[in-house]
A protein has these predicted regions:
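Negatively charged
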Residues: 1-705
Length: 705
């Protein structure tokens, strides 16, 4: 609808026009003849309308008390002439122009001497300039959200009188304006300054004259002020403040901050208070910084990446329940005095010291952790920490210990003697990349509820002794990469391992170079689906018995025994390969094997056999007469460098689907191969001249030299 005719309207006695044209879908609205003499309420009058052209020149507004939300969400209205508005009786202008598209409007005609509520008046607007020098704000009590996310280039509040204002929360949040002068602001009665300058674009915010003796909430006050270089808070009276959470969060260019006069005896929440103050290199906490009532210190110093030292010896923490990520990513922090911390009420220590890459010593022997429920990631990336004594830790309520010591690659001594793991369900990456640990005794661990042990000891590169023989693994589902890259580990006692629920063992022993003995005869799981690379690069293994291994659901057996150089005995008698699709590199470089019994192998679904037996240089005979290869597409280098292989029966081979068969018998100098010429015609030209070929056709052999 283009326009709307109101000429027939008789409104001479109407007092309430709130919502009258709210959400109306018209472009033009001429109200020059609308009688508004008796109207006292114009709130939401044009709220959310589609109006582009609006005529209110003849409005009589002398009696109007409420203009709140009047033009809010008028997204198509660019200009409106309110020069005849008389607002001398208006009390409420809450969100009057909020989220509108108005760009030019003459506000000098507005009389605001009785207005008490200016909440959100210009929030989310794009006025080219806001000249408010005529505004009388002496009666206003609420200015919260007033200029929130206002994109005006010029805002003049130099004549503001704010002595009665109690709420300034979000007042300048997200403001993008030039050279704002706050010197006129009187904050004597303000109780709420939360989010006041959040995400502000200014490099300097002069608040040195602020009176804050009545302020109760400073949460998010300067959060995200990433351009601010200097903040003078030395005169702040914070004696009544209860919430300082996120107060300086994200002030990434703030190098100095004076909080020496902060009185914090009533503060309950300090969550993320200094988070991401990445340029801050010093913080001085005096005795006036009283934390006796604080319950939340989560991420309080997180990502204060320039802090080198922290003295928190005055901190009282007996009521704190959350210390998660408290020092997370304090990358330069070398010393932190938390010797007097009382952690008896703490429930969450997740990532508490995570990524403290320069922390060399940590005195937490007095920590009480009987109520802590989460410690995952607690010490991860503490790359310089050499010793850690957690023998006093009570971990009875912990269910997640994942990545607890991840990347503590300088850690040489770790005391976990009294760890209670009765309720732990997740131990993924728990000791991963503890590259300097040589001995680890976990005999006290109760793992009856653990479901995930993947990557648990990954990259424990110097570990020579690991006591886990008492582990109960009956509930474990994932053991993938559990011992991968334990280069120095020569023995593992796993005979009591119960893997009935395990589905994934990918890479479990990969790169355990020195592992000599491994009794996995008890391993039996009928739901196992992943074992590729399982023993890859176990150079020192001499024997393996997998006769009880249920592999009926396995589809990928690639690289399982690759580079098991010392393997002399391998029992695969009952292996089920009926679902396997790839066997590439399966026995590659098993150069101590002299024979292989693969009579149980069913290869009907296999597509990849490249490098399967390559470099098995001691292998003398191999019976593959039952192998089915009609679906195989790649047999490149399958037997390459099997120098001692004398006889190879591949008479069952059908290579009609094969697309790649380069160097199939490369360097098999002593080999006699038995094959069906008709089924293997594609590979004939790839057989080198030094290989003796015997053809079989209806059980009749012929020899070609």
């Amino acid at each position: 609808m283009e326009s709307f005719n109101i000429n027939g309207f008789n409104t001479e006695n109407v007092e309430d026009m709130s919502f009258l044209f709210s959400l109306i879908k018209i472009k033009t609205l001429d109200l020059s003849n609308l009688n508004t003499n008796q109207v006292t309420n114009m709130s939401y009058m044009f709220y959310g309308s589609s109006i582009e052209r609006l005529n209110v020149l003849n409005f009589q507004t002398n009696n109007v008390i409420d203009m709140s939300h009047m033009f809010e969400n008028c997204r198509n209205l660019r200009n409106v002439d309110i020069q005849n508005f008389r607002t001398n009786n208006v009390i409420n202008m809450n969100s009057m122009f909020a989220n509108s598209s108005l760009q030019d409007i003459n506000l000098t005609v507005m009389n605001t001497e009785k207005v008490k509520d200016m909440r959100g008046m210009f929030k989310y607007t794009n006025f080219r300039r806001l000249i408010l020098s005529n505004f009388d704000t002496s009666q206003v009590t609420d200015m919260s959200h007033m200029f929130q996310s206002c994109q005006s280039m010029l805002i003049n509040i130099s004549t503001f009188k704010t002595q009665n204002v109690q709420n300034m929360s979000y007042m300048f949040q997200g403001l993008n304006a030039w050279n704002m002068d706050y010197s006129s602001l009187r904050t004597d009665n303000v109780k709420d300054m939360s989010h006041m300058f959040e995400d502000n674009s200014f490099s300097n915010i002069d608040i040195s004259f602020f009176k804050t003796n009545n302020v109760e909430n400073m949460a998010y006050m300067f959060k995200g002020c990433d351009s601010v270089i200097k903040l003078n808070t030395s005169n702040f009276d914070t004696s009544k403040v209860t919430d300082m959470s996120h107060m300086f969060d994200g002030c990434i260019n703030l190098a100095n901050l004076d909080i020496s006069n902060f009185g914090t005896s009533k503060v309950l929440n300090m969550e993320e208070m200094f988070k991401s103050c990445s340029s801050l290199n010093h913080l001085n906490f005096t005795s006036s910084f009283d934390t006796s009532k604080v319950t939340n210190m989560a991420s309080m110093f997180k990502s204060c990446s320039s802090l080198v030292s922290l003295d928190l010896s005055h901190f009282t923490t007996n009521k704190v329940k959350d210390m998660s990520s408290m020092f997370d990513s304090c990358k330069k922090l070398k010393n932190v005095d938390i010797s007097n911390f009382d952690t008896s009420e703490v429930k969450d220590m997740t990532k508490m010291f995570s990524n403290c890459q320069n922390l060399e010593k940590l005195n937490i022997e007095k920590f009480k952790t009987n109520k802590v429920e989460s410690m995952n990631y607690m010490f991860e990336y503490n790359t310089k920490l050499i010793s850690l004594d957690l023998s006093n830790f009570n971990t009875q309520k912990i269910s997640d210990m994942s990545r607890m010591f991840y990347q503590c690659n300088s850690l040489e001594t770790l005391n976990l003697d009294n760890f209670n793991t009765n309720n732990v369900e997740d131990m993924t990456y728990m000791f991963s990349n503890c590259k300097s640990l040589k001995n680890l005794d976990l005999s006290s661990f109760n793992t009856q509820k653990v479901k995930d042990m993947s990557f648990m000891f990954e990259h424990c590169e110097q570990l020579t002794s690991l006591e886990i023989s008492s582990f109960d693994t009956s509930e474990v589902v994932d053991m993938s990469n559990m011992f991968v890259n334990c280069y120095e580990l020569d023995n593992l006692e796993l005979s009591n391992f119960n893997i009935k629920k395990v589905r994934d063992m990918e890479n479990i022993f990969q790169n355990c170079y020195k592992l000599k003995n491994l009794d996995i005869s008890s391993f039996n799981s009928n739901i196992l689906i992943n074992i590729n690379n399982m023993f890859q690069n176990c150079y020192s293994l001499t024997s393996l018995d997998l006769s009880n291994f249920d592999t009926s659901n396995i589809k990928d057996m690639s690289h399982i025994f690759e580079n098991c150089n010392d393997l002399k005995y391998l029992n695969l008698r009952n292996i089920n390969t009926s679902r396997v699709k790839t066997m590439k590199n399966m026995f590659n470089n098993c150069n101590s094997l002299t024979s292989l019994d693969l009579s149980s192998f069913i290869t009907t679904n296999v597509e990849h056999m490249e490098y399967m037996f390559s470099n098995c240089s001691m292998l003398e005979s191999l019976d593959l007469s039952e192998f089915s290869t009609e679906n195989v597409i790649d047999i490149n280098y399958m037997f390459a460098n099997d120098e001692n292989l004398l006889t190879l029966d591949i008479s069952s081979f059908n290579t009609s689907s094969c697309q790649s068969f380069e160097n199939l018998f490369e360097n098999c100098f002593n080999l006699t191969v038995i094959l069906n010429k008709e089924k293997c015609s594609e590979i004939m030209k790839e057989i080198p001249e030094y290989v003796i070929i015997k053809y079989v056709d209806n059980n009749i052999f012929s020899t070609l030299f």
